[in-house]
Amino acid sequence: MKFLKPIVILFLLFSTVLSGGCGHTKEDKERIIRYLDNRFGKDTYTIKQDESYYRWFVTLNQYPDLTVYYTVSRDPLSMTSPSITTNFDEVFSEHAVEEYKKTHALGDDDLVFDDSIDFVYHTKVKSLEELKVPYDRAMGFIAFVSEKYPVLIDEGVLNIRMDITGIRLKGADDDDTLIFQDISKAKKDGLSIVSYEEICQELAPKLKTHADNPDGFTFHADIGKSF
């Protein structure tokens, strides 16, 4: 009998949450439809309720092979509740990367979707001159998305960061082997792209031009001080 009361309380709490969720079903669908109409326009998508009743599957007419979900989340402690959540960014971004790689060779480089950034392009070079090739590949991806998946740009999902190894910045720690360089920023009026020349101008003065000397300075009587 001691355990009966906690069990009853848990059952009542679960029933309340469940009934509350079901009670919001119609309201949630209307909220999602308003959101979709505002983002993509009326009659540009199909929407189907999941069997769980808590989310809706949406397919844009322009992209019939891709289906994403939308759901309404409620948090009584949040000032922004209820809010709409979706896996749109992940589904469309990963698909765009997959399709781009089918027809564009990246060599030893890699391009991935990262939900905290959008896209990350990984490359290893020995000089800024070598950086031109991976930079052009990243620009090729932007051109590909602009042509095939412009909805990503419309939704502000084309931020690209280039993670560079092989060259190092002055004063960098021994374990600090990465240079992070933003090359594309999604803004309300389109994309802000950093040119290759701008990247070189920014990084050139900061790069190490010689390997670290663990023994410190070396002096030569005939030629003076060398590093």
Predicted regions mapped to residue ranges:
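Short, non-transmembrane alpha-helical segments in secretory-pathway proteins
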Residues: 22-46, 93-101
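Exposed beta-strand-loop-beta-strand "reactive/processing" segments of non-cytosolic proteins
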Residues: 43-72
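Extracytoplasmic electrostatic interaction patches
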Residues: 93-94, 102-227
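Sec-dependent N-terminal signal peptides of Gram-positive bacterial secreted proteins and lipoproteins
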Residues: 1-24
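Short, ordered beta-strand-loop transition motifs
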Residues: 48-53, 74, 110-117
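A short, surface-exposed beta-strand/turn
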Residues: 66-89
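Generic recognition of long tandem-repeat/solenoid scaffolds
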Residues: 56-59, 79, 119-122
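Terminal accessory regions that mediate trafficking to/through membranes and regulate activation
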Residues: 6, 20, 36, 57-59
